[in-house]
Amino acid sequence: MGAPPKTAQNLSFVLEGIHKVKFEDRPIPQLRDAHDVLVDVRFTGICGSDVHYWEHGSIGQFVVKDPMVLGHESSGVISKVGSAVTTLKVGDHVAMEPGIPCRRCEPCKEGKYNLCEKMAFAATPPYDGTLAKYYVLPEDFCYKLPENINLQEAAVMEPLSVAVHIVKQANVAPGQSVVVFGAGPVGLLCCAVARAFGSPKVIAVDIQKGRLEFAKKYAATAIFEPSKVSALENAERIVNENDLGRGADIVIDASGAEPSVHTGIHVLRPGGTYVQGGMGRNEITFPIMAACTKELNVRGSFRYGSGDYKLAVNLVASGKVSVKELITGVVSFEDAEQAFHEVKAGKGIKTLIAGVDV
């Protein structure tokens, strides 16, 4: 990959094909609506989906057919506002919600805009992402930051919003026990949000010792490394070692791994709640007998919806959730591809790419 142009107006990090990226100077995007704002992007976190597109060129039905700007976990500074904008001004620091729904379909009108079939989501084909100098969003999808949240932390609001949505789907209430499978960024944030929602017992489960050690220091009250035994045996150990009685109240899977799904179902008490937040293979086997006989509440969770981003910002602003510990590396925009290699190699927790000229 060549060096970025020296005089670029809107330098962008573009995926052309599998493991084929380039820097490209693109036109500065124009405001499409009177309520739009132009954001000078300052920091962008790298998500597993970004790496998946870089490695495979597709995720399920979403296939990169034309060159696409990567990135969707971003923060920035307002550079220009539309004529009808009333809540933001030039110079405001914001967290950027990267998916714009149609606002007219039934899911949108029901407040479930994350299920909008016409969602224009950053770095999801055919829509360009946020790894550019400038990006346009509606004003109500930019969240003004209080003074105690910096722009690096603001780039973590996107995965935090994913975790907020998962925990809300689980209806976590004070006093309930929660077991979280997967101690990657979203799983770790689920632990933190569950604690903020009042759970006194949050157990993180993962196969990587380093991730578990981080989870224990960060937000989990206990950790568990599965053995190479059956899902039922691992589930029994989790229950017994953590005094969960008849089982956990809530299980969240943030891994997408089939063994985690099986173990999670067996960990739950009768009448417990299971939420699938991690995505793995399209189809897996599922312990349907246990789910039926225990009358489990089984739910999915996808991205984030109404109020999730705002709550994410409020949780950090109030000190109930901290995200700065998750930021384990920052690279310059010119070294953007390095961040993808680091994430693929499993280095650190959350790597950020600084914006152009930052």
UniProtKB/Swiss-Prot annotation:
Cofactor(s) needed for function: Zn(2+)
GO terms, molecular function: D-xylulose reductase activity; L-iditol 2-dehydrogenase (NAD+) activity; zinc ion binding
InterPro entries: ADH-like_C, ADH-like_N, ADH_Zn_CS, GroES-like_sf, NAD(P)-bd_dom_sf, PKS_ER, SDH-like
Gene3D superfamilies per the UniProt record, alphabetical: Medium-chain alcohol dehydrogenases, catalytic domain, NAD(P)-binding Rossmann-like Domain
UniProt: Zn(2+) binding residues: C47, H72, E73
Record keyword Oxidoreductase present: yes
Keyword entries, A-Z: Carbohydrate metabolism, Metal-binding, NAD, Oxidoreductase, Xylose metabolism, Zinc
Pathway: Carbohydrate degradation; L-arabinose degradation via L-arabinitol; D-xylulose 5-phosphate from L-arabinose (fungal route): step 4/5
UniProt catalytic activity: xylitol + NAD(+) = D-xylulose + NADH + H(+)
Domain of life: Eukaryota
Residues binding NAD(+): G182, A183, G184, P185, V186, G187
Family annotation (Pfam families): ADH_N, ADH_zinc_N
Cofactor note: Binds 1 zinc ion per subunit.
Family designation: Belongs to the zinc-containing alcohol dehydrogenase family.
Protein name (Swiss-Prot/TrEMBL): D-xylulose reductase A
